[in-house]
């Protein structure tokens, strides 16, 4: 059975280069490269390209619209104040019921 890899990005809205880094990763994973083919044979990839969409749209640098740094609420996310983190944790729990998660990668990048 294939294992899982979860990749997330843009938990901090101001980390624009993280989107480009993730785009490069996805381009590679979809390529004909031998290594990419091996990874696709061994893993299922779950990719969340932009965790903090509202923060990005509103020009925030680090927080969501509730003023929360989403990187600090993973242990106990609020359904109302940090719904995306809440949903990603639920997704990870559902994945764990079916397969092993080998990697959870949260991409950060600055200029």
Per-range role (PLM):
Residues 1-111:
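Active-site/substrate-binding loop(s) of hydrolase catalytic cores
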């Amino acid at each position: 059975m294939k294992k899982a890899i979860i990749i997330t990005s843009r938990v901090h809205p101001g980390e624009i280069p993280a989107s480009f880094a993730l785009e490069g990763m996805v381009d590679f994973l979809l390529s004909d490269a031998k290594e990419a083919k091996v990874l696709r044979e061994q893993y299922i990839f779950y990719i969340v390209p932009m965790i903090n969409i509202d923060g990005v749209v509103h020009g925030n640098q680090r927080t969501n619209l509730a003023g929360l740094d989403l990187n600090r609420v993973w242990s106990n996310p609020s359904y109302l104040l940090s719904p995306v983190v809440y949903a990603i944790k639920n997704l990870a729990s559902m994945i764990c019921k079916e397969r092993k998660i080998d990697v959870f990668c949260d991409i950060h990048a600055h200029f």
